[in-house]
Design a protein with these regions (language model features):
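A short loop-to-beta-strand scaffold at the N-terminal edge of the catalytic core in hydrolase folds
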Residues: 52-62
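Glycine-rich "HGGG/HGxG" loop immediately N-terminal to the catalytic nucleophile
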Residues: 83-84, 106-120, 182
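Conserved acidic catalytic loop of the alpha/beta-hydrolase fold
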Residues: 124-144
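Short glycine-enriched nucleophile-adjacent loop
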Residues: 154-165
Length: 217
């Protein structure tokens, strides 16, 4: 019994040391990241909740100079928040722009189980996008801003810029989405082909049951 007790105590001691090491390493890493990405005097770094489309949605604003041009970055998905990567992504661009990351409705910090499911539709996302654009223009007293979108976000950004060209200095698309239905069809055909090649009958039958896009909502 004494031997077993000693083994357990030894394991507990090792685990305790490992936990201390993990937490200490994280604290050191966090402080290093904060030092490397801290905004200088005259800059801005702010995580905020704003009301968009009648619900609370979150934005992260970062830039080395408050009077630099405003750049709204729209993530992909829908639902694929990229705010957690912002400090790594924006290392250089925050020197020349005030970058605004936005967690769209239902994504990241903007998630809530109380958001009506019917509001998850294209026009609502587009409405949210333009409402945020208007909010940023008013807050920073700008006539125009820059808008950049990735994947699904490139669609929202492109359509918003097309509908309201006078509100933007420029539009930038990353992994530009051009035809959503065609995009889903190509993905479906690829998945079906892979399931057949890999002899994955379950996946193959599931895909056949789902059917080819466009999907009914």
């Amino acid at each position: 019994m004494k031997t077993v007790k000693k083994i357990f105590l030894g394991i507990a001691a090792v685990l305790a040391v490992l936990l201390v090491y993990v937490f200490a390493s994280k604290a050191i890493t966090d402080r290093k990241m904060e030092r490397e990405t801290a905004m200088p005097e005259g800059g801005i770094s702010s995580l905020e909740s704003v009301t968009i489309g009648g619900i609370s949605q979150w934005i992260l604003i970062r830039g080395e100079k408050k009077d630099n041009p405003i750049l709204l970055y729209i993530h992909g998905g829908p639902g694929s928040t990229e705010m957690f990567m912002s400090r790594k992504m924006d290392t250089e661009i925050v020197k020349d722009f005030v970058v605004v990351h936005w967690d769209q409705r239902g994504a990241g910090k903007s998630y809530s189980p109380f958001i009506p499911s019917a509001s998850y539709n294209r026009e609502q996302y587009l409405s949210d996008t333009y409402e945020l654009v208007s909010l940023l223009k008013k807050r920073f007293s700008r006539n125009k801003i820059y808008i950049m979108g990735h994947s699904w976000g490139s669609y929202l950004a492109a359509v918003t810029a097309h509908r309201h060209p006078d509100d933007f200095c420029a539009f930038v698309g990353i992994g530009q989405m051009v035809n959503a239905v065609e995009n889903e069809s190509v993905s479906y055909d690829f998945a079906l082909k892979r399931a057949l090649i890999e002899e994955n009958k379950e996946a193959f039958n599931d895909l056949l049951e789902i059917g080819k896009p466009p999907y009914k909502t």
